[in-house]
Amino acid sequence: MTRKATQADFHFIKTLYFHPKTNPFLLYEMVDSERFEDIFNDLQAKKLLHIFETEGVARGMFKLIPLEFRTSHIAYLGGVAIHPDYFGAGFGSQMLLEIIELCRSMGLRRIELSTATINEKAIRLYEKSGFQKEGVLRDYCWLKSESRFIDEVMMSCLL
């Protein structure tokens, strides 16, 4: 099931953001705890953070950002991560199915996301879940840990 994140989810989300297997593919570089708390509180206040859980255990997270005006039929999906302890258990597929259903229930027509072109596992998962590639943003993200720019692939799913 997916639900809005609460203050009680801070530690889980922080663990995901700082985990070496997930951080390279998330928006924020490693920051100190105080800065991360500011980021979390800002996202929390805007009610953008969601938790995916099964059997009462948090397994993953995502941000869902509804767009406005002429694009109010679209949501941007970001910060998608499954905790590495649960890699390979099918939770990524399950979470994406639930995200798609959530977006349908919100009356949305389109979900957009971007991910690093080097994140091949995520791209396969998104494609398996109905997302299609729409283009590549060259030198889009600076990966500080590797001192290089990386390309991002834009993807979408029409509902």
What do these predicted regions represent?
Residues 7-10, 14-85, 96-98, 102, ...:
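Acetyl-CoA-dependent GNAT
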Residues 74, 123, 134-140, 152:
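A short, glycine- and basic residue-enriched loop/turn
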Residues 103-114:
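Conserved GNAT acetyl-CoA-binding A-motif
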Residues 70, 79, 83-97, 106, ...:
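Conserved glycine-rich acetyl-CoA-binding loop
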Residues 74, 110-112, 154:
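Structural preference for beta-strand elements that scaffold enzyme active sites
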Residues 112-115, 127, 132-147:
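Conserved catalytic-core motifs of GNAT/GCN5-like acyltransferases
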Residues 145-159:
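Terminal substrate-recognition subdomain of acyl/acetyltransferases
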